[in-house]
Swiss-Prot record:
Pfam families xref list: Ribosomal_S17
UniProtKB keywords: Ribonucleoprotein, Ribosomal protein, RNA-binding, rRNA-binding
Assembly mode: Part of the 30S ribosomal subunit.
Record flagged with keyword Repeat: no
Name of the protein in question: Small ribosomal subunit protein uS17
GO cellular component, one term: cytosolic small ribosomal subunit
Any single biological process term in GO: translation
Gene: rpsQ
Functional note: One of the primary rRNA binding proteins, it binds specifically to the 5'-end of 16S ribosomal RNA.
């Protein structure tokens, strides 16, 4: 196992859950045949202890131990407010 903690940056889609947020992570994938770069989005549930995020915020999250069935990421900081 590596010692580096995975961190990602994404946009908050939803904050309707208590102490939880849904973050959209965008990445670019090259099409195997045509070579065009396509945007692909992954939704991740993250833990927000102080309920400080709103929809549209750009945030940094890091991986942690599983906190629930779907949450294994936690909020590090809010980069920009919506």
């Amino acid at each position: 196992m590596s010692d580096t903690i995975r961190t990602l940056q994404g946009r908050v889609l939803s904050n309707k859950m208590d102490k939880s947020i849904t973050v959209a992570i965008e990445r670019k994938v090259k099409h195997p045949l045509y070579g065009k770069f396509l945007k692909r989005t992954t939704k991740i549930h993250a833990h927000d202890e102080q309920n400080q995020c709103n929809a549209g915020d750009v945030v940094t999250i890091r991986e942690c131990r599983p906190l629930s069935k779907t949450k294994s990421w936690t909020l590090v900081e809010v980069v920009t407010k919506a």
